[in-house]
């Protein structure tokens, strides 16, 4: 499927590469290519843990800003009321006075200079570790190793307030210091080193325990039969009404495609598994499947309710250029 839609490469979890068939000669330090022609890079475990680990990862340093202490909740209600939600509900303002400080202890005030000093130290540590890692690997490999470091974008600046500055200092050090490596994208690496081992990656994901249990377990498995049924029906509609002109039916078909995609959003199943805003996630799945199903029968029976269609579009107007024919 990836190759069919022009995707040249993807990134898999560490075990997705280590358990590939046949076993990759260079482990996670060189890409592999599947029989279908899609190239896979694997997350590097060492560099990932240095940033992501909840125990000793960089973002958890005690000098960094505490994400969970916000004046929207900390300040006296009468003082903060003009700056929170118009209905009086406390919300995050983005203004946070405290640093992480430690575990299970009173929080100290955030000190910008301490945080910036820590960034400098950690960026240097990351650089030294990659330098040593690449030097070691190069002695065992006859091609340059690649250290693939994928991270969620929301880590930098959102969860880890100092994260963007850490990236800036790291890149600055790499540019000015004498390094035994260069920064490179997967696409650039493929262009420079096009020969690679043919192997099939093992199934993997970024979710807890590395497979699919976050999105398929006893708390959310009920949703899958409805999602599969809706997907089959979407394909049925596209086959029955191909290449509709600029008609009400086409608008309804496109809206069906929107509702299906929104119902399939992996966030709903993730939220249910994690136990946060569970009822909201259940309701979202039910609402999107419900709207899809109602439109499905209206289209099949040639009884499209224009007012209902407009109502649904006003609620869910994402993907304005969507074309239902992708399901043909």
Across the structure, where does each feature detected by a protein language model lie?
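His/Asp/Glu-enriched short active-site or ligand-binding loop at hydrolase and phosphoryl-transfer sites
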Residues: 8-20, 184-185
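A conserved hydrophobic secondary-structure block that centers on an alpha-helix together
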Residues: 1-4
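Active-site and substrate-binding clefts of carbohydrate-active enzymes
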Residues: 21-22, 26-328
């Amino acid at each position: 499927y990836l190759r069919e839609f022009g995707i040249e490469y993807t990134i898999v979890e560490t075990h997705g590469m280590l358990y590939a068939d046949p076993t990759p000669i260079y482990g996670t330090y060189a890409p592999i290519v599947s029989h279908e022609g899609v190239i896979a890079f694997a997350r590097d475990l060492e560099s990932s843990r240095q940033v992501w680990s909840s125990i000793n990862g960089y973002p958890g340093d005690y000098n960094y800003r505490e994400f969970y202490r916000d004046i929207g909740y900390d300040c006296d209600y009468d003082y903060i009321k003009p700056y929170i939600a118009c209905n009086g509900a406390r919300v995050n303002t983005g203004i946070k006075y405290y640093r992480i400080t430690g575990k299970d202890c009173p929080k100290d005030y955030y000190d910008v200079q301490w945080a910036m000093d820590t960034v400098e130290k950690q960026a240097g540590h990351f650089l030294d570790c990659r330098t040593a890692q690449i030097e070691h690997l190069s002695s065992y490999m006859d091609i340059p190793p690649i250290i693939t470091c994928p991270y969620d974008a929301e880590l930098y600046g959102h969860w880890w307030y100092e994260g963007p500055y850490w990236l800036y200092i790291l890149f600055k050090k790499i540019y000015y210091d004498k390094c035994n490596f260069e920064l490179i994208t997967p696409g650039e690496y493929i262009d420079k080193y096009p020969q690679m081992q043919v192997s099939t990656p093992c199934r993997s994901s970024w979710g807890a325990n590395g497979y699919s249990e976050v999105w398929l377990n006893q708390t959310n498995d009920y949703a899958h039969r409805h999602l599969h049924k809706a997907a089959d029906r979407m394909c049925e509609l596209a086959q029955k009404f191909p290449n509709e002109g600029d008609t009400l039916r086409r608008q309804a078909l496109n809206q069906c495609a929107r509702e299906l995609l929104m119902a399939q959003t992996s966030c709903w199943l993730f939220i249910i598994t994690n136990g946060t805003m569970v009822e909201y996630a259940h309701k979202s799945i039910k609402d999107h499947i419900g709207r899809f199903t109602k439109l499905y029968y209206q289209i099949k029976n040639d009884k499209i309710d224009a007012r209902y269609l407009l109502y649904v579009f006003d609620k869910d107007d994402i993907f304005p250029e969507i074309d239902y024919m992708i399901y043909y």
